[in-house]
């Protein structure tokens, strides 16, 4: 009996001691799980821990600093490159317009060539504009109170001509408010809706639903297109990624719309993912935490 009690007491002590000893490791693991490209400087590990874990914490924090510097340099390069490209692209567009005005009568081959030049120059201009926006995201204040419902209706009005070309029905349900950048959230929902229209079937539907659930504001954009293959569902948020390159060119995309959407969601502390996708359509789900939204 005494032996059993000693064993039991030893087991209890070992449990509490091991729990205390492993607490810094659990804290370390929890912080690692929180790391995102937009919060590198906010997820550092406190270095005032047990000596055994102090070096782990220091190395981890140094790694975050290097990553943050790398991302900052990448954003700086992207912004500089976009700035440098804007002027020559503007000159090219002006020269094309001037040539067309001075030479209204040209051969069919020349007309086709000029049309191709205009399309590609406009595409490059849009790409440059988006890259510039992505490089400047962190300078945009996210402190405005935004009503999602009216914003969705405004987006539907702006995209109505595009939807009418394929006889796409635009539908919205629910509403909600949140704190953020009105300009960026408009761009987020505009990009998702435009994508859902462009890659939809003729006579299809685009449905945006807004709701509060599990302490989050949820926004879903559902289309009736042909779906996204399983291997590509995470890759679609990468810059310049295309599931079907030829189809993307036909639809006029530059491959940055969903990447910009991901950046905007991350800036607001949210998450974006492909919730469902099949041959019957795709649902893109966006969620914002309660500290960025309110009932």
Enumerate the predicted regions with their spans:
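Short helix-loop "hinge" at the ATP-lid/N-box region of the Bergerat-fold HATPase_c
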Residues: 196-197
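Short beta-strand/loop element within the Bergerat-fold HATPase_c
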Residues: 203-215
């Amino acid at each position: 009996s005494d032996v059993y009690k000693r064993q039991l007491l030893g087991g209890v002590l070992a449990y509490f001691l091991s729990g205390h000893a492993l607490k810094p490791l659990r804290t370390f693991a929890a912080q690692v799980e929180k790391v995102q490209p937009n919060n590198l400087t906010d997820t550092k590990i406190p270095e005032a821990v047990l000596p055994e874990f102090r070096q782990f914490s220091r190395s981890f924090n140094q790694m975050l600093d290097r990553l943050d510097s790398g991302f900052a340099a990448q954003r700086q390069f992207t912004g500089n490159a976009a700035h440098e490209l804007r002027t020559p692209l503007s000159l090219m567009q002006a020269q094309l317009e001037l040539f067309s005005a001075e030479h209204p009568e040209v051969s069919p081959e020349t007309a086709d060539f000029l049309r191709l030049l205009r399309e590609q120059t406009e595409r490059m201009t849009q790409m440059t504009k988006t890259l510039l926006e992505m490089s400047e995201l962190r300078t945009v204040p996210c402190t405005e109170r935004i009503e999602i419902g009216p914003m969705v209706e405004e987006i539907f009005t702006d995209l109505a001509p595009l939807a009418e070309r394929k006889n796409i029905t635009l539908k919205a349900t629910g509403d909600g408010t949140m704190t953020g950048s009105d300009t960026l959230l408009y761009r987020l929902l505009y990009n998702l809706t435009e994508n859902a229209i462009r890659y939809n079937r003729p006579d299809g539907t685009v449905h945006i639903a807004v709701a509060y659930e599990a302490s989050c504001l949820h926004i879903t954009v559902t289309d009736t297109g042909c779906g996204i293959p399983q291997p590509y569902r995470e890759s679609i948020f990468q810059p310049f990624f295309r599931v079907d390159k030829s189809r993307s060119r036909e639809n006029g995309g530059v491959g940055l719309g969903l990447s910009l959407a991901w950046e905007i969601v991350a800036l607001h502390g949210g998450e974006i993912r492909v919730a469902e996708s099949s041959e019957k359509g795709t649902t893109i789900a966006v969620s914002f935490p309660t500290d960025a939204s309110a009932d």
